[in-house]
């Protein structure tokens, strides 16, 4: 096979066994990689109703066939497991250099099972694999962990995926971190890693990924890179200002969620924009492996020195969503969230939930520990500087916040003020200003998520063409489905979503065929994406998903018209779109997958 080693590493932390397993090209053609591999093994080997923190839950690190190649952004990997935040599938994507290094070591994926009886880390040096004691780094921050483990193994070139104290303490939105600030962020994958007493995976590889026709592959790659460089977003806005270039754009379009989605316009947006960040704090760009875009930021603050980020989502989650406009405070908060290993979107969403519950009188000052604790008021930067540390350590009221926004709101009888889907906090786009995006939120397999359908592209940015954000026709619903399947394909290939700014489905076909030696059509590849999406949906249904209750949005977004800005008066007309979405997906009226659809997609073994 080209693009693959055909090798999976299986590690049982309970009994310490380490096994090499193989797969063939038929398997690769069906599941492609990353999310595809992950959902296959979860469905095949695990009861979807298992407790996410039990040893029976599996934690899978998987690459794609283009991971480790020179394909633009070909450094991605994913972490797949059952989420302790949602109770459903978690698949978190990260860039940096860890994914490529895992591929260079000769492995396509790692399946982690069981639970160690003490803190350990996994050391992979090509085909040599060891489970080592991690007691000396347990409790350390992410940067401290990376430094200590590089010194211990005597190799500064190893790549490390690790958890911080938030993962160790099973904060339900803990992330897996690599290269300091790259995060497999959402769904609590870091908490699952912590529940297994696995502190880190350290990898060093010396192999190179083989492609079917190197000359043809490089010709195709050069063409795709040129398209990306000519694109105004991939070749202009993102390299110049990072992902926070979206702050002003989304705010001007009136869907920049402010103060827990109470409105879509933030009066201080420019002060936390990518333009402002570049002018005040930027030192240099920092691209991930094989990336011609280079959206990563290295910033400098006197209080913490050099740091990376924040990205658009983090800037919003720790800024406008909390009514906070001080960019230095946002950068510092993002830094510590990374060091502790926390998903900034869920962190900000949880704090925003606490702020609204507090301001509405549902959370009292005595509930959070008395008069000496910083009050949860919108705009209070002290909340960032204080509660992030308490959450990561599960200290005081931080222990309650560490459960996430939904469980917090449920505890204080205010679930209508939790802005999330399937218990996962929503990201930085108010769907009252992009209704197709709202449908994507509601039907997303991992809960509140933007990057598994990113309808912001057509509805706001005009990719692949401009669509009216308030159109809810069949064409819009079909586009949501296409984007869901396409993003599953891009993930499975081992590429970054940002390549869609400049590339389309045919471009991914070209790269994959040249690398793998296949003769697949665009439709063949999109069918893989559809298979993955439906398999993840099936896992959720088996885990207990009630579609008609849970394929929904917060009441505010469905019933409270946007109070100001370009989308004033709009709500998300989800009830008018959802039945057509189910029908166009080939599902039943109550959102379940019929047997004939499963057979059509080759999923009959999971019926």
Curated annotation (Swiss-Prot):
InterPro entries (UniProt xref): Ald_Fedxn_OxRdtase_dom2, Ald_Fedxn_OxRdtase_dom3, Ald_Fedxn_OxRdtase_N, Ald_Fedxn_OxRdtase_N_sf, OxRdtase_Ald_Fedxn_C, Tungsten_al_ferr_oxy-like_C, W-dependent_AOR
Keyword rRNA-binding recorded: no
Alphabetical list of SUPFAM superfamilies matching this protein: Aldehyde ferredoxin oxidoreductase, C-terminal domains, Aldehyde ferredoxin oxidoreductase, N-terminal domain
Alphabetic keyword roster: 4Fe-4S, Iron, Iron-sulfur, Metal-binding, Oxidoreductase, Tungsten
The reaction(s) this protein catalyses: an aldehyde + 2 oxidized [2Fe-2S]-[ferredoxin] + H2O = a carboxylate + 2 reduced [2Fe-2S]-[ferredoxin] + 3 H(+)
EC number: 1.2.7.5
Single Gene Ontology MF annotation: electron transfer activity
Listed PANTHER family: ALDEHYDE FERREDOXIN OXIDOREDUCTASE (PTHR30038), TUNGSTEN-CONTAINING ALDEHYDE FERREDOXIN OXIDOREDUCTASE (PTHR30038:SF0)
Description of how the protein assembles with itself and partners: Homodimer.
Family the UniProt entry places it in: Belongs to the AOR/FOR family.
Protein name as it appears in the record: Tungsten-containing aldehyde ferredoxin oxidoreductase
Organism of provenance: Pyrococcus abyssi (strain GE5 / Orsay)
């Amino acid at each position: 096979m080209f693009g693959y080693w055909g090798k999976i590493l299986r590690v049982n932390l309970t009994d310490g066994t380490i096994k090499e397993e193989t797969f063939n090209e038929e398997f690769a053609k069906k599941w492609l990689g990353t999310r595809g591999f992950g959902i296959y093994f979860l469905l095949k080997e695990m009861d979807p109703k298992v407790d996410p923190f039990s040893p029976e839950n599996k934690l899978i690190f998987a690459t794609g066939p283009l991971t480790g190649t020179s394909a633009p952004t070909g450094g991605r990997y994913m972490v797949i497991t059952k989420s302790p935040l949602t109770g459903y599938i978690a698949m978190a994507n990260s860039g940096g250099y860890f994914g490529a290094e895992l591929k260079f070591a000769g492995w396509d994926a790692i399946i982690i099972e069981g639970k160690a009886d003490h803190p350990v880390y996994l050391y992979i040096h090509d085909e040599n694999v060891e489970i080592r004691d991690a007691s000396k780094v347990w409790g350390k921050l992410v940067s401290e962990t990376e430094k200590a483990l590089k010194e211990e193994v005597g190799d500064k070139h190893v790549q490390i995926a690790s958890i911080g104290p938030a993962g160790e303490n099973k904060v339900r939105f803990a992330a897996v971190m690599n290269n300091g600030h790259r995060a497999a962020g959402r769904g609590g994958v870091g908490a699952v890693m912590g529940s297994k007493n696995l502190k880190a995976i350290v990898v060093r590889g010396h192999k190179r990924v083989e492609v079917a026709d190197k000359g043809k592959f490089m010709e195709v790659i050069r063409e795709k890179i040129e398209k990306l460089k000519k694109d105004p977003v991939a070749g202009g806005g993102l390299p110049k200002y990072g992902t926070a270039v979206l702050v002003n754009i989304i705010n001007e379009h009136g869907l920049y969620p402010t103060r827990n989605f109470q409105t879509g316009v933030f009066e201080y947006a420019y002060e936390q924009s990518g333009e402002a960040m570049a002018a005040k704090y930027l030192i240099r760009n920092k691209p991930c492996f094989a990336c011609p875009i280079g959206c990563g930021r290295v910033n400098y603050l006197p209080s913490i020195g050099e740091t990376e980020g924040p990205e658009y989502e983090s800037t919003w989650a720790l800024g406008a969503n909390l009514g906070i406009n001080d960019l230095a405070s946002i950068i510092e908060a993002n830094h510590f969230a990374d060091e502790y290993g926390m998903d900034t979107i869920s962190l900000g969403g949880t704090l925003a939930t606490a702020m609204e519950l507090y301001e509405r009188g549902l959370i009292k000052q005595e509930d959070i520990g008395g008069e000496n604790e910083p009050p949860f008021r919108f705009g209070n930067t002290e909340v960032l500087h204080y509660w992030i540390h308490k959450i990561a350590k599960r200290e005081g009221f931080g222990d309650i916040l560490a459960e996430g926004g939904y469980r917090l709101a449920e505890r204080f009888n205010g679930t209508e003020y939790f802005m999330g889907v399937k218990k996962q906090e929503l990201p930085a786009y108010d769907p009252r200003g992009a209704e197709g995006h709202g449908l994507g939120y509601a039907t997303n397999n991992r809960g509140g998520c933007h990057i598994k359908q990113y309808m912001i592209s057509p509805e706001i940015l005009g990719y692949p063409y401009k669509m009216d954000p308030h159109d809810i026709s069949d064409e819009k619903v079909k586009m949501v489905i296409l984007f869901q399947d396409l993003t599953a394909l891009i993930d499975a290939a081992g590429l970054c979503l940002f390549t869609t700014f400049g590339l389309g489905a045919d471009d991914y076909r070209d790269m994959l065929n040249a690398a793998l030696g296949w003769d697949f059509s665009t439709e063949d590849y999109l069918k893989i994406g559809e298979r993955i999406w439906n398999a993840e949906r099936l896992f959720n249904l088996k885990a207990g998903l009630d579609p008609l209750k849970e394929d929904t949005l917060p009441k505010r977004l469905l019933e409270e018209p946007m109070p100001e800005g370009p989308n004033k008066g709009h709500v998300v007309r989800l009830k008018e779109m959802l039945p057509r979405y189910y029908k166009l997906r080939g599902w039943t009226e109550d959102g379940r997958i019929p047997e004939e659809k499963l057979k059509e997609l080759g999923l009959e073994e999971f019926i």
